């Protein structure tokens, strides 16, 4: 068994005395692809920030890439983490290729007088192609669709060859076509990068890629269930997590939600 990429042990986070997370534990290994689900206010964003070394626990321990938060150079640690936030706003008038290249420097814009190496240019082009944007290499960021922006940001996050990829509601604001194109490419990444671990946050089961291997459900800052995806995303667990009776269906690797009782006309 490989060493954990992430190890969260009995973590509590409190702000102004109010608990945001309570007694949460999680272990993620290389090649695992986790979904983090729960209603608004469940603590998903706070947990994701800790996994990305952007926040520290009030109690408990968090190890990211084998390093314990509080005992490591955070800047060096973040170089091994790819973070995809659809709210990210590139600085300046950049093309798709240039936005992806900012992932090499982990900056919002291109650094003055910085020049990408031939290897970095080749990697940026490879990732743009991999994310299905080969026809948009030189397109301006401002004219991209929301779905194209999302895929560009995933390519950007992969530029430093991270061991861990964090996706914060990547399908937010996408129409049906944009969502499906994004999920198709995320699923492809899971096959082309077999050692990459990922954690994807969402409210919606329909936004989970078929390659999802594990899931954690949060409610009111506590774990409802965590483990292998087929054992966690069940009718009983989802109904409890969202405090609403539903039926969970899975077809060809994708999940959907139906009312617990057939609706009467």
Task: Cite the ranges covered by each PLM segment.
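The feature captures the beta-strand-to-loop junction immediately N-terminal to the Walker
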Residues: 37-39
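Conserved catalytic motifs of ABC-family nucleotide-binding domains
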Residues: 161
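Catalytic Walker B motif of ABC-type/P-loop ATPase nucleotide-binding domains
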Residues: 165-169
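Conserved ABC ATPase signature
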Residues: 140-144
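Conserved ABC transporter NBD signature motif
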Residues: 60-70, 77
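Conserved ABC ATPase "signature" region
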Residues: 101, 116-136
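Helix-to-loop junction immediately C-terminal to a conserved catalytic motif
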Residues: 52
């Amino acid at each position: 068994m490989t060493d954990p990429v992430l190890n969260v042990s009995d973590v509590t986070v409190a702000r102004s005395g109010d608990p945001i997370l309570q007694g949460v534990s999680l272990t993620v290994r290389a090649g695992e692809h986790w979904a983090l689900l729960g209603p608004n206010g469940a603590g998903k964003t706070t947990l994701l920030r800790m996994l990305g070394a952007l926040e520290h626990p009030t109690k408990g321990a968090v190890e990211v890439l084998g390093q314990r938060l509080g005992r490591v150079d955070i800047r060096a640690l973040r170089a091994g983490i790819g973070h995809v936030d659809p709210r990210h706003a590139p600085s300046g008038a950049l093309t798709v290729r240039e936005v992806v290249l900012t992932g090499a420097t982990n900056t919002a814009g291109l650094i003055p007088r910085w020049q990408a190496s031939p290897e970095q240019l080749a990697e940026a082009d490879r990732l743009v192609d991999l994310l299905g944007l080969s026809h948009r290499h030189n397109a301006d960021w401002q004219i991209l669709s929301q779905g194209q922006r999302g895929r560009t940001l995933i390519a950007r996050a992969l530029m430093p060859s991270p061991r861990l990829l964090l996706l914060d509601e990547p399908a937010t604001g996408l129409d049906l076509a944009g969502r499906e194109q994004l999920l198709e490419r995320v699923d492809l990444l899971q096959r082309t990068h077999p050692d990459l671990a990922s954690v994807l946050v969402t409210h919606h089961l329909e936004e989970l890629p078929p390659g999802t291997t594990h899931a954690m459900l949060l409610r009111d800052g506590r774990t409802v269930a965590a483990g292998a995806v087929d054992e966690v995303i069940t009718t009983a667990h989802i109904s409890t997590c969202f405090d609403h009776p539903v039926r969970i269906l899975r077809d060809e690797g994708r999940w959907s939600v139906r009312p617990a009782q057939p609706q009467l006309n």
